[in-house]
Amino acid sequence: MQTRNTFSWIREEITRSISVSLMIYIITWASISSAYPIFAQQNYENPREATGRIVCANCHLANKPVDIEVPQTVLPDTVFEAVVKIPYDMQLKQVLANGKKGALNVGAVLILPEGFELAPPDRISPEMKEKIGNLSFQNYRPDKKNILVIGPVPGQKYSEITFPILAPDPATNKDVHFLKYPIYVGGNRGRGQIYPDGSKSNNTVYNATAGGIISKILRKEKGGYEITIVDASNERQVIDIIPRGLELLVSEGESIKLDQPLTSNPNVGGFGQGDAEIVLQDPLRVQGLLFFLGSVVLAQIFLVLKKKQFEKVQLSEMNF
């Protein structure tokens, strides 16, 4: 009887341990997923607002350059490269969520015309695969195959991101036409300053929420500070919480004003957006152009031959 109770107790403990481990895994996985800079997918139906502004700029407040290179023209049902360049100083270090310094990561969103989409693996050439590396692209939404996102990925390795794109074929997709189309891109380097819920990260400036005298600065055990501000007019105390990793600009006994910076600005990254144009070219139009150019060349050749023949006739008449 005692042995049976012992086995029952062991079985309950194992079940409880598995349940706890599973819960920890789910919570950890969720926090990792939500930590990716693809927050726009969770909060915006379309990453590009009606004003043309890409919503990533809501979290990445600093303005930095980004560039995109695409062919001027592409033929239907062909694969081409869209290269997004996110330049920055590789020597820079950013403040990580744990307060330590680390390398910058990068991310990008590519908004293609309707009908254009990520090329399937079997259509990508070995040379293009080598340029892509180990990158894994995602659709912004299952029904928005023309909008692609990537990141975060190590900036030192992927400051240039090559997207393999498959051009549509108007012969099979009646919604696509042989026209000039715009392509929009947004790219960030480094962490954002604002989370989607509106709260600040530790990668931005923290300002005083009240004016007065700093009566106390408490350094927290796990990093960060609690700054107590006393309003001299009514003795009201306000405590501002500063997360770890930030450098203070103030000291105890100092008089400060409302919204005065309490920390330096740690942000070394930023977000930028750009655009390009691409022409989906009709192959028949290309063939017609080649035929026309060939006709012009042949006409020039016949003209030269005719001129030489005429000169020979003139020369023979003069000799006669």
Curated annotation (Swiss-Prot):
Free-text comment on the cofactor: Binds 1 heme group covalently.
Topology of this chain in the membrane: Single-pass membrane protein
Example GO molecular function: electron transfer activity
Ribonucleoprotein recorded as keyword: no
Compartments where found: Plastid, Chloroplast thylakoid membrane
Signal sequence, renumbered to the chain: 1-35
Cofactor(s) recorded in Swiss-Prot or TrEMBL: heme
Stretches that traverse the bilayer: 286-306
Superkingdom to which the source organism belongs: Eukaryota
GO cellular component, one term: chloroplast thylakoid membrane
Xref: InterPro entries: Cyt-f_TM (IPR024058), Cyt_f (IPR002325), Cyt_f_lg_dom (IPR024094), Cyt_f_lg_dom_sf (IPR036826), Rudment_hybrid_motif (IPR011054)
Main localization category: plastid
KW Transcription (keyword) present: no
Alphabetically ordered keywords of this record: Chloroplast, Electron transport, Heme, Iron, Membrane, Metal-binding, Photosynthesis, Plastid, Signal, Thylakoid, Transmembrane, Transmembrane helix, Transport
Binding-site residues for heme, renumbered to this chain: 36, 56, 59-60
PROSITE patterns: CYTF
Biological-process GO terms, alphabetical: photosynthesis
PANTHER family named in the record: CYTOCHROME F, PTHR33288
UniProt subunit comment: The 4 large subunits of the cytochrome b6-f complex are cytochrome b6, subunit IV (17 kDa polypeptide, petD), cytochrome f and the Rieske protein, while the 4 small subunits are PetG, PetL, PetM and PetN. The complex functions as a dimer.
Family: Belongs to the cytochrome f family.
Function: Component of the cytochrome b6-f complex, which mediates electron transfer between photosystem II (PSII) and photosystem I (PSI), cyclic electron flow around PSI, and state transitions.
Protein name as catalogued: Cytochrome f
Species, as recorded: Nasturtium officinale
Lineage: Eukaryota, Viridiplantae, Streptophyta, Embryophyta, Tracheophyta
Gene name linked to the record: petA
